[in-house]
Swiss-Prot record:
Any Gene Ontology CC annotation: cytoplasm
Main subcellular location: cytoplasm
PROSITE patterns: ARGININOSUCCIN_SYN_1, ARGININOSUCCIN_SYN_2
Binding residues for ATP: A9, Y10, S11, G12, G13, L14, D15, T16, S17, G116
Binding site for L-citrulline: Y86, N122, R126, S174, S183, E259, Y271
Name the UniProt record assigns to this protein: Argininosuccinate synthase
Signal peptide: none
Organism of provenance: Bacillus thuringiensis (strain Al Hakam)
Amino acid sequence: MEKKKVVLAYSGGLDTSVAIKWLQEKNYDIIALCLDLGEGKDLAFVKEKALSVGAIKSYMIDVQEEFANEYALMAMQAHTLYEGKYPLVSALSRPLIAKKLVEIAEQEGATAVAHGCTGKGNDQVRFEVSIQALNPYLEVIAPVREWKWSREEEIAYAKENNVPIPINLDSPFSIDQNLWGRSNECGILEDPWAAPPEDAYEMTLALEDTPNKPEFVEIGFEAGVPTTLNGTAYPLSELIKTLNALAGKHGVGRIDHVENRLVGIKSREVYECPAAMTLITAHKELEDLTLVKEVAHFKPMIEQKITELIYNGLWFSPLKQALNAFLQETQKNVTGTVRVKLFKGHAIVEGRKSEYSLYDEKLATYTAQDEFNHDAAVGFISLFGLPTKVYSQVNQKKVEA
């Protein structure tokens, strides 16, 4: 029987390494796909490991700039904080991974794609909904969800089939990382009362270890896109990396969150997002300076919906594309510079300026230079309060009667 081809999203860990052997037993030729999302792994080693385990071909693709410009940027502009806290670190990368899986599958003539997600997480939904949106004819295989092995059973299978056991297998944590941040769950973190141990963190320093002197950074934006740090221009992926190091050194971006998962359970996760939280904070302040009130007040409703769509795996949905069109329209004048103080876990905006600033000091001042027409306030108040006044008059008459 001729073997079918499957493209596997490969991380180099135990689950996806075992999946190669498991898929071989199901009569598949496996093509491994590993993406460089800025997590800092030795991906050349991961690429070769896939071949040594049994893949017939192995791809390693650097998608850092694509991830930064087409995914993280939108999240920043939409101030996406799921349940007010989580900047969608993992949720943002899943549609890009799904997109590349589909592209390689079509290029290689594969009939299926596979991922290493379990049956109780959000990522299985994000991957499979995205894949269906991009190519509804591809079969999607989820080996870990199908085999339902315990960790001990999986290790035993790996040993029987000469699959290398990762040296960090004893780590209690499940970690996912990319340019936009780092997520950490499992182990002691499953107890919502337990304080996260310091070894749960990698990108940020504990407050006790951060500098006792603040550091200032000026972030330049052009049409909503961060382009400079302290006057130096960077590609967006490099700007994010640089800011991760700067803000992380000051303990910015630590998040401890009990979140409501898409699949109906609550999960406690620890996130580190120094650049994401700094950029979202700075960008919001620049919008406050440059957007008219009606747009500034309406945009958070769109942001909330965009956040939910991304979290729920609906990146490629028609609604998300439509809302993105609104989002891009709001960014045309979000150009300027924001000065941020990084200190003891905080990213504090201390100054902002823009050629499109709608702040008029002559109208806002209380000094002798005040140009605001105070006399106009009388008529404005009369008209603005008229519906409330009429309502009160009518109802007071009924009470008196």
